[in-house]
Amino acid sequence: GMKDYFKKLLQKVIKKIKSFRKKQD
């Protein structure tokens, strides 16, 4: 359902932010 879709989308965004922060350091 929609909740599953948003959970997956949120996880993708979190992974991108984490990898982006690693590149910054």
From Swiss-Prot:
Q: Name one GO biological process term.
A: killing of cells of another organism
Supply the alphabetized keyword list: Antimicrobial, Cytolysis, Secreted, Toxin
Q: Does the keyword Secreted apply?
A: yes
How is this protein annotated for GO cellular component? extracellular region
- Give the molecular function GO annotations: toxin activity
| Tissue expression from the record | Expressed by the venom gland.
Q: Where in the cell is it found?
A: Secreted
- In UniProt terms, what function does this protein have? May have cytolytic and antimicrobial activity.
Q: What is this protein called?
A: Oxyopinin-3c
